[in-house]
From Swiss-Prot:
Alpha-D-mannose 1-phosphate binds at residues 28, 130, 141, 148, 186, 188. This is Phosphomannomutase. The active site is at 19 (nucleophile), 21 (proton donor/acceptor). Involved in the synthesis of the GDP-mannose and dolichol-phosphate-mannose required for a number of critical mannosyl transfer reactions such as folding and glycosylation of secretory proteins in the ER lumen. It comes from Saccharomyces cerevisiae (strain ATCC 204508 / S288c) (Baker's yeast). The modification Phosphoserine is found at residue 240. GO terms for cellular component: cytoplasmic stress granule; cytosol. The keyword Phosphoprotein applies.
Length: 254
């Protein structure tokens, strides 16, 4: 633990990590003033960080332009892009790991499958290529908030994403990939081990005695599951940002 950097905190050996969508913000929407104030209070007591599957630009939209200064740790794409006290750490690349030939086969299968799904609505950006993963959305990431809510209800009834994931697992069993359903409208595809637990390697040297994690998709198959059940963390399952504030207030006497 670096005394000089974190000694001012009441609990410098405690780290609290947060998922973004559904935990700090409503899905794809911006953070509320109540959550911001709660996090500011919490940061005086212990170290805080966020870890999400989206790239940093989307997290800046949701959490604000000063997010790198307001969190001790900032983990985009599950920690493949990482910042500690505003300074960038080493990153990884999905395409370099998988290779162009395999990625082409994967992308062609995904696009063909997307074209054959029976859906009431389609919008745009069905396959999003990121540094550390790809994100697949049957309705498309350009869907409005209302359309996202509609798809989420439709998906719960028809299991569109779950069936899609099973088809991918069957088609590419030897690719070493993980398929993780998260948010309302999409799922992530990334190398095994590149889930949210990936970010924990960035904090190992700081010697935290307690690492708490707050997330909403903590069920098996959800994109918070692996870090939620990891033996290195104390997991907290939440239903909404309001729920996050409530638990934090009680747990840390804010």
């Amino acid at each position: 633990m670096s005394i000089a950097e974190f000694a001012y905190k009441e609990k410098p050996e405690t780290l609290v990590l947060f998922d973004v969508d559904g935990t700090l913000t409503p899905a794809r929407l911006t953070v509320s003033e109540e959550v911001r104030k709660t996090l500011a209070k919490l940061r005086n007591k212990c170290c805080i960080g966020f870890v999400g599957g989206s790239d940093l630009s989307k997290q800046l939209e949701q959490l604000g332009p000063n997010v790198l200064d307001e969190f001790d740790y900032s983990f985009s794409e599950n920690g493949l892009t990482a910042y500690r006290l505003g300074k960038e750490l080493a990153s990884q690349s999905f395409i370099n790991w998988l290779g162009e030939e395999k990625y082409n086969k994967l992308a062609v299968f995904i696009l063909r499958y997307l074209s054959e799904i029976d859906l009431p609505k389609r919008r745009g950006t069905f396959l999003e290529f990121r540094n550390g993963m790809i994100n697949v959305s049957p309705i498309g990431r350009n869907a409005s908030t209302e359309e996202r809510n509609e798809f989420e209800r439709y998906d719960k009834e028809h299991q569109i994403r779950a069936k899609f994931v099973e088809a991918l697992k069957k088609e590419f069993p030897d690719y070493g990939l993980t398929f993780s359903i998260g948010g309302q409208i999409s799922f992530d595809v990334f190398p095994a081990g590149w889930d949210k637990t990936y970010c924990l390697q960035h904090v190992e040297k700081d010697g935290f005695k307690e690492i708490h994690f707050f997330g909403d998709k903590t069920m098996v198959g959800g994109n918070d599951y692996e870090i939620f059940v990891d033996e290195r963390t104390i997991g907290h399952s939440v239903q909404s940002p309001d729920d996050t504030v409530k638990i934090l207030t009680e747990l840390f006497n804010l």
